[in-house]
Amino acid sequence: WADIHGEKEFGMMNNIISLFVKKVPTALFLEVRDQGTEYLEKTCPPHVDIHYGLFRDVDLSRYQLVILVTPFLHNTHDTPALFYVPKVLHVGVGLAHQAGPVHDIVENILGTMINSTFMPRAVKYIATINEKRNEPVIKELERAYQIRYYSAEELKEISVPNPSPVVEKHM
């Protein structure tokens, strides 16, 4: 869905711009609502249909272009697509002391997000406990993401649907 390398990326973007300027039937799928999407709704041209709800309910056969505002990966099949990825995900990370290999753990975290259809670009911040501040995995994640640190007291106040017995032991 996104090529991040030079000529191919610009060729894809030029194709998307060309399709939009030609006013081909376009689906605008909004999975996040904010000031930016409100503006898109207010200024939507006639060749664009706005969709909400479940992406699987959008009949892609009606469109030659899809624009998505979403933190999720969606398969647009052969329909050209432009993804706007808002930073809306808050990811909590806990790990063993000096966990490694660092690269493998970071790849596992990102892979788990992708396998759950979340785009890593949608991460607003990663949260962890203060004691993990100097862990190599956290330092590596800090290169790409904002990290928020919390005290054990602060974390006790947060309701978690599936609490970890290991984490609760340290709280």
Put a short name on every predicted segment.
Residues 1-2, 137-171:
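Long, charge-dense
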Residues 1-11, 23, 27-132:
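Conserved mixed alpha/beta catalytic, RNA-binding, or beta-rich assembly cores of soluble enzyme
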